[in-house]
Amino acid sequence: MKEIIARHKAGEHLGICSVRSAHPLVIESALLFDLNTDNKVLIEATSNQVNQFGGYTGMKPADFRDFVYGIAQEVGFPRERLILGGDHLGPNCWQNEPADTAMEKSVELIKAYVAAGFSKIHLDASMSCADDPTPLDPMVVAKRAALLCQAAETTATDEQKRHLTYVIGTEVPVPGGEASAINAVHVTREQDAARTLQTHQAAFRALGLDEALNRVIAIVVQPGVEFDHTQIIHYQPQAAQALSAWIKETPMVYEAHSTDYQTRQAYRALVRDHYAILKVGPALTFALREAIFALAQMENELISPEQRSRVLEVIDEVMLNEPGYWKKYYRPTWSQAMVDIHFSLSDRIRYYWPHPRIRQSVEKLIANLNNVTLPLGLISQFMPVQFERLSEGVLTPTPHNLIIDKIQDVLRAYRFGCTPDVA
């Protein structure tokens, strides 16, 4: 990460896409996408996905590291080009507990991530705990972030410190996506970004963490990009000019969250304006969902009814029976909720792919289609972009390849934005 940031600050139009997903096909897609380049691949886990208690994936930080390394080994991707990051590391998962208890758990969270070899650490103590006022005083946020940094510094070996980097600050949306519709988004004011830096510098120095300040590579801000279930707010460079100008005077860059579904040109403009780290998550699993839905339509055309996977029906059954991951996010009317379940841009379906019934039905879908020839016309009907790539000779028409390539459509847009010589 340090090299990428240094090159950006030296004037190169260079950024990096941060893949924030725990889905094996998404991770495989990202690694295969850059397998034959010299690029680093940044894969991040969030504190609610992966923590010392397992998170919703059931993985602790060391488990997630081994999970990613296992996929890298399968596809032949060299570990030295992998960067592992931890996102929103702090009391996010324990906001309903008193601050002292939540911070104790947050310190252990940081230690677990660093001990497992994660080298990009987002120190995010911005959320109020059960006995805190709302919003938190910025100096309290900074002092808590400094405590988390101290935990990282005491855990990291000298070798790890060569690569260890920190990100500070937070964006407006809650981690995991908006729970309600958005009409506009507040662009971070440059004076607020400056205050974030100043308060963190003071808090770090108060704990003797002067050396660690040199490892702070980025500040999370809101450049004016967001999405909810049905809408996308696109980047407007003119609205963030003052913010872009301010960061030039520092040794840091910005990290932008919720950049999913922006245009290729928007990604290029964001990197030009010093948002050199672009987070993406739901857009990748949205593409995965689109691919599986498309393959399910092909299955309906090619496989006899009694042999089909029923994957779409199984997804509906599981999500309606176990609505915990989507109920408070989606519209209450049944017909509208079904549209959201299937097609929402916030893609709450992503939490259900590991479910045993859904996983088995997806496996059967792929097995069924592996046993037949996929007609080009059928691929054109349901996956027209992949049909074009088949015609160009860069893709072989297997179900697995079609899913991977569909996910890589998203990564192609980020590559355009992050790399100046990509047309």
From Swiss-Prot:
Pathway(s) of this molecule: Carbohydrate metabolism; D-tagatose 6-phosphate degradation; D-glyceraldehyde 3-phosphate and glycerone phosphate from D-tagatose 6-phosphate: step 2/2
An annotated GO cellular component: plasma membrane
A Pfam family reported for this protein in Swiss-Prot or TrEMBL: GatZ_KbaZ-like
Keyword S-adenosyl-L-methionine set for record: no
Subunit structure as annotated in this protein's UniProt entry: Forms a complex with GatY.
Role this protein plays: Component of the tagatose-1,6-bisphosphate aldolase GatYZ that is required for full activity and stability of the Y subunit. Could have a chaperone-like function for the proper and stable folding of GatY. When expressed alone, GatZ does not show any aldolase activity. Is involved in the catabolism of galactitol.
Protein name, entry field: D-tagatose-1,6-bisphosphate aldolase subunit GatZ
Taxonomic lineage from the root: Bacteria, Pseudomonadati, Pseudomonadota, Gammaproteobacteria, Enterobacterales
